[in-house]
Amino acid sequence: MGCIKSKEDKGPAMKYRTDNTPEPISSHVSHYGSDSSQATQSPAIKGSAVNFNSHSMTPFGGPSGMTPFGGASSSFSAVPSPYPSTLTGGVTVFVALYDYEARTTDDLSFKKGERFQIINNTEGDWWEARSIATGKTGYIPSNYVAPADSIQAEEWYFGKMGRKDAERLLLNPGNQRGIFLVRESETTKGAYSLSIRDWDEVRGDNVKHYKIRKLDNGGYYITTRAQFESLQKLVKHYREHADGLCHKLTTVCPTVKPQTQGLAKDAWEIPRESLRLEVKLGQGCFGEVWMGTWNGTTKVAIKTLKPGTMMPEAFLQEAQIMKKLRHDKLVPLYAVVSEEPIYIVTEFMTKGSLLDFLKEGEGKFLKLPQLVDMAAQIADGMAYIERMNYIHRDLRAANILVGDNLVCKIADFGLARLIEDNEYTARQGAKFPIKWTAPEAALYGRFTIKSDVWSFGILLTELVTKGRVPYPGMVNREVLEQVERGYRMPCPQGCPESLHELMKLCWKKDPDERPTFEYIQSFLEDYFTATEPQYQPGDNL
């Protein structure tokens, strides 16, 4: 959110629509859950005890060869999603997947591998637990633990992770051939996929995916001639022998420690004194962004809003919705100071805004494959917002944040509609982002997910031009007039025409003719296999 913003109408054209979209949730309702397919979830532990080592799945029939499916190349870091589970308190022993340093006196510090009994797991994101080693009790983040001796506790198990995110992780610089992970299958409920980094002379570094099937008697196999009682034994076998795979499994794919869901238990509306502003990262028309520390323990980003920017009551109501939007391509909202001046506390992203990254950082040297992959990540996050029936309203490079390994996350979703500034609400002047805004939104205030699609098309031009201001040489009033007459930006220098065609789809005059974000995500993720397989790097891209 700043001096610029974006919007447009909902209702995808039929050729882009799919039938498996989750039921949408109104953005004005404050009690909905995150999308189960993509959100960074906490385990749901409730109800009766279950066997965590039982993995029911649809059996597969018939023999199978060692033919991998899929494949790709790119770079990114993702967080493995925790397992879904249920239990009654204290029966199952849990094991720590990561180290955790206590942030409050009520928290419990622990090391990876430490074991716990869960005392109270009714709180969702934070559980009361007792360390078996020390006897100490305290709250722990529920997405940092898994049932001991379950598949979720294995280092190589990455849970709900899509093919593309697996490829981004495995293809990170420094990873070697044979590095691997196991994840849930995207296409077959209850099944698994083995993803391995490979290399060949034609494709260079790439990733191969093998489907792990289940026998009627409960065993697992990739090929029927080699069957195993458990996934653990299957992985152990292929770590010792390639046995038909593209390469023997070597080391487990490294990953980053996931973000906790919130700063701590009950840390939502926090006192201003608990925050220390340390390094000013930027400023805009409505406030500043700082790197800071919460409670003397936790690095965070803090957005400070100028008094009068928005009504505190309206902000708090919207923030309650925003904090429920959970997806690994959205910057998580941790906490708020709800009295003016309003503070918004979020995850700190190491590389700052995408706009600055492209203009002044490492982004200046990126080639088209990396830029398209970043666009695909943004589309992934926007597809989630689309499924949740929410609207961003200010989608542009300045509101995308970049982390390590070219991770992109969407920030400031939903805040633009709360701005009280007269110049902004009149959709005129320097504070309003005319150049990113769909005409029906700029002229008539009709902001929908389809105006976000228009804005995404503008964001694509920012990516391929390394942060150039859209419509170069034109002032806001001229842009609005020319766009209404049918003018659209020409193909940027070095940009493939196929990518410009996607931009023009986003800029269709009729909002209903613009593609869905689901379509855009699919198009960009498969861009170099389906659309531009003969891509050769040029001077700029």
Curated annotation (Swiss-Prot):
SH2 domain: residues covered: 156-253
Lipid-conjugated positions (S-palmitoyl cysteine): 3
Listed Low complexity bias regions: 26-37
Post-translational modification as stated in the protein's UniProt record: Autophosphorylation at Tyr-424 maintains enzyme activity.
Residues binding ATP: 281-289, 303
Compartment annotation: Cell membrane; Cytoplasm, Cytoskeleton, Microtubule organizing center, Centrosome; Cytoplasm, Cytosol; Cell junction
Recorded catalytic activity of this chain's protein: L-tyrosyl-[protein] + ATP = O-phospho-L-tyrosyl-[protein] + ADP + H(+)
Lipidation (N-myristoyl glycine): 2
Enzyme Commission designation: 2.7.10.2
GO CC annotation, single: cytosol
Claim: Cytoplasm is one of the keywords in the record: yes
Matching PROSITE patterns: PROTEIN_KINASE_ATP, PROTEIN_KINASE_DOM, PROTEIN_KINASE_TYR, SH2, SH3
Coiled-coil residue spans: none
Biased composition range(s): Basic and acidic residues: 1-20
Role played: Non-receptor protein tyrosine kinase that is involved in the regulation of cell growth and survival, apoptosis, cell-cell adhesion, cytoskeleton remodeling, differentiation, G2/M progression and cytokinesis.
Recorded family membership: Belongs to the protein kinase superfamily. Tyr protein kinase family. SRC subfamily.
UniProt protein name: Tyrosine-protein kinase Yes
Annotated gene: YES1
